[in-house]
């Protein structure tokens, strides 16, 4: 026997007769005797029914074969769970059509009973592979040779049977035509192309083979990345990506820090050239405590809070009020003023609304509104007592917040603070109702083509104003306030009289604007000015708007303008044809330096105007300016103040949700054209996405500043530049308020005994009478008089009530 045959077993010589005689293969008795076995049906289920996984009770009984005990099934039948298991199996098998899998019912049973295992049928899979020793003839070839014509082989695979049972019946014999790549890419032309190193075509690299190729064009371009109508996706917004975008847009603003600029200005030498000036000792402390303000996370050219010291005020006066340009020629002021006022009236006022100008102004109702505002808070600070006041004397101050710089000059020139010249609250409250009522009359007679965003129409969002195929005129008037002279004052007088403003008030207002005195009591600076605009009185915005409209009407034909927006010294003209503006008249007649932007864009009041699908206009703030406002350094550490800045930020970004991809793409091109920077379009997209992200809620906005949550603040170490949480309780903090009841403690009393601490109350041993005198002298005189008058009125009421009671 062979060593491969175990003892006790006989070796049968295999017969290959079946390869030539089909009768041996189809012996039914032989097949039944060997391969068919009878299964014992313990659950009483009819096994002759085809096993499927359709979620019914019958399929559950056939697949799971539960035991029946006292009428209950074990495991119990849960129809919802069994149906979900069957559905999951069908979904999985639809995606695994190329694999040999176990029957669906068995897979559903494994999921239902939570049995671990694989759905792949590995019963006939092994690592053994037969060695091909044939001479080219296979079993399939013999089957084809011996196939009986007209006889169909029936597929008995369980998976195929289940797939056939789930097939939906065809309702139509027509096959629908579907969209293919051949329909999308169409060959439009043919040309000859060469292949430099195609070895499959030719080995002659000196003279490469040229062959005809078809040039295809994509008929469905909406899925391309550069299509302007498709959205472009970016990474998640972060402070690092936003700061990188800001540094790329404004390279000179990167890591700008002016912490020590105020100290350098105060400690260095100073030279100023002003013709007439009065200077005395200043009482302003230029030190700025950095621990009182939020530290922004971004470093994109934001400025520190500017303090109005004497040198800072002199620098601001030098730029904003001194050195008035003298560009105009000698003209007849009275005649030219009448001509300008007449052109203003013909260009802007409607003929049907001129009759409204003769009506009386509703001044009393406007004065009542101001009185109600004062009554709500009853703030007596700055209220003028009924006495004689010099209207030619103006108070002066500087703006602590510096306007964002959008030019690449931050490394060469320090931005100068803007100045504010204003009357007291008493004078302003007296004149404001008159100018408010005058503007209401003016707006009723104004043509609808011209828009002045103030009051109830303060928004730049306009309806039915298309921007497509239009020309724009964007003019920049530099040195606008101090360039105004006597001519501007005179045609303002004529315009106010034509609008129905009372003549005595008009003449009075214009007369005390001829010569005025600017006074800054804290900085100790006084300077006389003449004719130029006062930047903080009751007529500032309305007057600047009237001056701009009058000069534009005199130098440009307003009949060709479809729409015009005027706001202070900002203006924007929208025309069907290219507008013509005589810039020489601005210089020779109105003493103004004007610069017409090229190209002129729909840009006004630091906002871009974009057109929606319904031909409406929405305004979007300038991203170059807003990205710097996210890094303000003047916000005091207070959750209420930080929330106020957040609400202001949300108000400016209220139209971001109306922007579609076309409008965003247009905005990016507008920014690139305005600032002559063609490579900032992607940075503008990052900035817009950041504006939408940080305007979602207050906590996201707090991420822009050194805060942890809302009420806990982080502090940066001045040397290690690390963030840490520190306590703010120091001995010096207790002495700021000598009325503090917590100080001193027992230990502090011991230290005071040895002379380390000073007294709590420096006025403790002073008599009550002397103390009251010192406190009253320290108070503001107008505030003291107001309090005294209020106390006197109460005393008079008390005396009158006592007398009335005694008389009864």
Curated annotation (Swiss-Prot):
Disulfide bonds: none annotated. Its EC number is 2.7.7.48. Keywords: Nucleotide-binding, Nucleotidyltransferase, RNA-directed RNA polymerase, Transferase, Viral RNA replication. Residues 470-583 form the RdRp catalytic domain. GO terms for molecular function: nucleotide binding; RNA binding; RNA-directed RNA polymerase activity. PROSITE patterns: RDRP_SSRNA_POS. One of its GO terms (biological process) is positive stranded viral RNA replication. It holds the Pfam family RdRP_2. RNA-dependent RNA polymerase which replicates the viral genome composed of 3 RNA segments, RNA1, RNA2 and RNA3. Interacts with replication protein 1a. This is RNA-directed RNA polymerase 2a. It comes from Cowpea chlorotic mottle virus (CCMV).
């Amino acid at each position: 026997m062979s060593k491969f045959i175990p003892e006790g077993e006989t070796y049968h010589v295999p017969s290959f007769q079946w390869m030539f005689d089909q009768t041996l293969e189809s012996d039914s008795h032989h097949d039944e005797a060997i391969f068919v076995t009878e299964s014992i049906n313990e659950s009483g289920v009819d096994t002759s029914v085809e096993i499927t996984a359709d979620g019914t009770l019958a399929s559950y009984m056939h697949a799971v074969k539960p035991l029946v005990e006292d009428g209950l099934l074990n495991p119990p039948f849960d129809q919802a769970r069994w149906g979900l298991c069957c559905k999951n199996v069908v979904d999985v098998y639809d995606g695994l059509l190329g694999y040999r899998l176990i029957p669906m019912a068995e897979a559903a049973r494994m999921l239902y009973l939570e049995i671990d295992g694989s759905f792949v049928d590995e019963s006939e899979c092994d690592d053994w592979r037969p060695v091909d020793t044939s001479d080219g003839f296979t079993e399939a070839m013999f089957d084809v040779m011996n196939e009986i014509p007209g006889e169909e082989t029936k597929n008995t695979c369980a998976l195929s049977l289940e797939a056939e049972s789930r097939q939906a019946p065809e309702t139509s014999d027509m096959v629908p035509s579907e969209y293919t790549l051949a329909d999308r890419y169409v060959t439009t032309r043919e040309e000859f192309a060469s292949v430099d190193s195609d070895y499959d075509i030719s080995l002659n690299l000196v003279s490469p083979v040229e062959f005809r190729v078809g040039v295809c064009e994509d008929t469905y371009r909406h899925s391309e990345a550069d299509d302007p109508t498709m959205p472009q996706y970016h990474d998640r917004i972060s402070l690092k990506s936003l700061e990188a975008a800001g540094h790329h847009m404004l390279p000179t603003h990167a890591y700008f820090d002016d912490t020590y600029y105020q100290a350098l200005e105060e400690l260095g030498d100073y030279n100023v050239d002003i013709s007439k000036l009065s200077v005395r000792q200043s009482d302003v402390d230029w030190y700025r405590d950095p621990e009182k303000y939020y530290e922004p996370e971004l470093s994109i050219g934001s400025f520190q809070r500017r303090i109005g010291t004497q040198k800072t005020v002199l620098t601001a006066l030098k730029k904003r009020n001194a050195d008035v340009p003298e560009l105009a020629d000698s003209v007849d002021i009275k005649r030219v003023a009448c001509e300008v006022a007449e052109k203003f009236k013909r260009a802007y006022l409607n003929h049907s609304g001129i009759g409204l100008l003769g009506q009386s102004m509703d001044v009393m109702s406007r004065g009542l509104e101001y009185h109600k505002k004062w009554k709500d808070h009853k703030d007596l600070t700055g209220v003028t007592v009924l006495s004689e006041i010099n209207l030619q004397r103006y108070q002066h101050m500087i703006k602590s917040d510096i306007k964002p710089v959008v030019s690449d000059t931050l490394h060469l020139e320090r931005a100068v603070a803007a100045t504010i010249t204003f009357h007291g609250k008493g004078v302003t409250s007296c004149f404001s109702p008159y100018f408010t009522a005058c503007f209401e009359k003016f707006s009723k007679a104004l043509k609808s083509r011209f828009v002045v965003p103030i009051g109830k129409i303060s928004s730049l969002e306009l309806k039915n104003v298309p921007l497509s195929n239009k020309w724009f005129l964007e003019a920049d008037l530099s040195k606008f306030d101090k360039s105004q002279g006597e001519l501007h004052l005179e045609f303002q007088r004529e315009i106010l009289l034509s609008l129905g403003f009372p003549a005595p008030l008009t003449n009075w207002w214009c007369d005390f604007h001829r010569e005025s005195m600017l006074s800054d009591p804290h900085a100790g600076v006084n300077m006389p000015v003449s004719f130029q605009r006062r930047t903080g009185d009751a007529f500032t915005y309305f007057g600047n708007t009237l001056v701009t409209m009058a000069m534009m009407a005199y130098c440009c034909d307003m009949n060709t303008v479809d729409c015009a927006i005027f706001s202070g010294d900002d203006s924007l003209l929208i025309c069907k044809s290219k507008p013509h503006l005589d810039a020489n008249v601005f210089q020779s007649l109105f003493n103004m330096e004007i610069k017409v932007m090229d190209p002129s864009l729909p840009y006004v009041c630091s906002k871009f105007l974009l057109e929606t699908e319904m031909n409406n206009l929405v305004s979007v703030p300038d991203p170059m300016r807003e990205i710097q406002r996210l890094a303000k350094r003047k916000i005091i550490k207070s959750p209420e103040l930080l929330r106020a800045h957040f609400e202001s930020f949300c108000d400016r970004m209220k139209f971001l949700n109306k922007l579609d991809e076309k409008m965003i793409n247009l905005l990016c091109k507008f920014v690139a054209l305005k600032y002559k920077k063609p490579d900032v379009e992607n940075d503008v997209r990052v900035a817009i996405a950041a504006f939408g992200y940080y305007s979602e809620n207050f906590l996201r906005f707090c991420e822009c500043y050194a805060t942890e949550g809302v009420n806990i603040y982080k502090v940066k170490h001045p040397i290690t530049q690390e963030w840490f949480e520190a306590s703010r309780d120091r001995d010096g903090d207790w002495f700021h308020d000598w009325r503090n009841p917590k100080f001193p403690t027992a230990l502090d009393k011991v230290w005071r005994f040895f002379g380390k601490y000073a007294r709590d109350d420096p006025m403790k041993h002073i008599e009550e009478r002397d103390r009251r005198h010192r406190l009253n002298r320290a108070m503001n005189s107008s505030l003291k008089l107001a309090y005294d008058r209020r106390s006197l009125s109460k005393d008079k009421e008390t005396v009158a009530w006592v007398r009335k009671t005694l008389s009864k």
